[in-house]
């Protein structure tokens, strides 16, 4: 085990999920840990109890840290980069590490890292399943909320033996404080406006791009065709500089310049191309699977499968396990999750849809008529893009709730869409959507917004949606055996 933190004094700032894991792991590694949180102790009583159970004495309520005694400060991703406690540490020449930087420094197993605005969790879980199917002991960690299958990255790094693999979902906030972080394989799935309340567009792009910062020339940097072919790619390069690593690409069409490292799809199938040593099978037609064999709905999930497949291939996984998972994986909770069928109406929970790009892809994934429940706190970008998605994607009716409901409604009416209702609670929204839906329709929770105005988090929002649907008599928890949601 890495000894960098042994007998060192380390302040851990932010006592939520990742900060508590840092306290636990760094204490186990022999560090003298000082837990710190700016909130009063009474507001974080459970966290205080957890660190005290480790034998640690927390500093809370904005009390001062003694920077002179610190060897390191490890910050949680929820702490803003401009927070005084971090900037004071920088001014005092205390090394500030993000949780993923600390995790990388103690990790014995290789890390395969994924970032992007949307699709990170689904891709991470897909990749994890591909590695497991290949017989590799796999840990999934980072900025991921997917039931019981994931953990903070520092805990995964601590637990994983050298022969294992760690799949890491990485946010832009986590990438703000890296210096030596160098994953074995890194992927950037997509970039669209998000977190405008905390980062400018330029800051957001620069943070995402840092996932490739320390890769060497022969190490895989996996990028979507969406990024490579758009105007923004040139802007990204202007902001952050070109990628030094070996670019692998994935997307809609085959690209000759990536003829030995490209994954693509067409209307019939998914294809995966690699160097001959990677791809000894079917060299003339590198078919991964037919599209009809894929269980996940939506073109965005086709791209998630391709990204995970490329990462697995780059890591040395044979095609068999990759194909097995590509054709059997049924999804992740709160991501286009089938809930029930009531009176011929399907209910789909996509509570993780928290921005405009995810909203558009959610609607595109379900071409049937649908009643959409949306709203919350819009995180940035042009709200008119939500209206455009509604107008062109067979939305029978829109039920809005939350802080940004007036703005979304105004944008939709300006675009000529009028079938809109307002709800004060999610339960009321489900009731209204049910009344508006017809047999064969889908009621889709796709908020396009953050949840904190009405819910604890997006998981709480999704759970409440499922609970509301579950109260209807005759709700079937099993999806139908035929059609788009068969075997899901």
Predicted regions and their residues:
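Nucleotide phosphate-binding/pyrophosphate-handling subdomain across enzymes
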Residues: 2-9, 19-29, 289-395, 413
